[in-house]
Amino acid sequence: MKPIHMNRMSWPEYQRRVQKDGATVFLPCGATEQHGPHLPLGTDHLLAAAVSESVATRVGGLVAPPLAYGYKSQPKCGGGQHFCGTTSLDAATLIGQVRDTVREFARHGVRQLVLCNGHYENQWFLTEGIDLAIRDLGPNPPLTVMRLEYWDFFTNPTLERIFPEGFPGYALEHAAVLETSMMLHYHPDLVRLDLIPDDGPADFPPYDLYPPEPAWVPPSGVLSSAKAATKEKGGWMVEELTDRIAAAVRKEFG
C-alpha cells in the first residue's frame, strides 16, 4: 500500500503523487476543545484525521497534517470557551489560514482537495476561506475543493440503530455517543470509560447571550450522556462514513 501521510513523505515523493498520479488530498479540520473528562482535547481533529485516513486509503488519496485549532467553542454545541484547554481562533484567523492553505495546495499542483471537518463551529469559516482562495486563483482555478462534515454521511437507519430511544441531534452530541464510539474505534487508548459523567442532556434556551453564560453548560462539558457508547457502534459508523464519503469523492473527482 502506498503511504498516505503528506508529512511523512519527501517533497519529490509528494510531488509525484499529486502532479503525476493526480492524488486527491484530504485536509482534516478540527479543534482543540474540551470533550468532557473521558475524551482528549484533540478529539475533533483526531476524528477528522482518522476519517480522512480511512477514505484516503480507499480512494488512493493523501492526508495532509490537520488544522488542529478551530473557531471558538459555542455553549450549545461545544460547551463554550470557559473550559481550560479549549484553544480557539477568531473567525478572521481561521478564514485566513484556510485561504492560505488552499492556495498553497493549488501551488503544489493539487487538483482535488477535500476539507474534512470535525468541529461543528468551523463550517461557515471554512467555506469563506475556500471561497476567497478560489477567487484569488482567478476565473479558471486549477483545483476543485470539496468541503464536508463527516457526520452528514450518517444515514437515518444507522442513527436509529445507534439511538433506539431517539437521536438527540448533532449539537447535543458533543462528547457523547457518536464521538465516544468513534474514538473507541480509532483511538481506544485515549478513552476513559470510567470517567464518563452523568451530565446531560443539556437544556438550552432558544437564544444566545453575550458574554456567554457558563451556567448553561453541564460542569463536565458533556452535552448528552456518552454511557451508551461502544466500540461496536463506532465500527458501524466508520464503515458507513468510509463507504459514503469515498463514493462522494469518486463521484466528483473520478
Report the location of each language-model feature.
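Extended, histidine- and acidic-residue-enriched regions that form the cofactor-binding/catalytic faces
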Residues: 1-113, 118-254
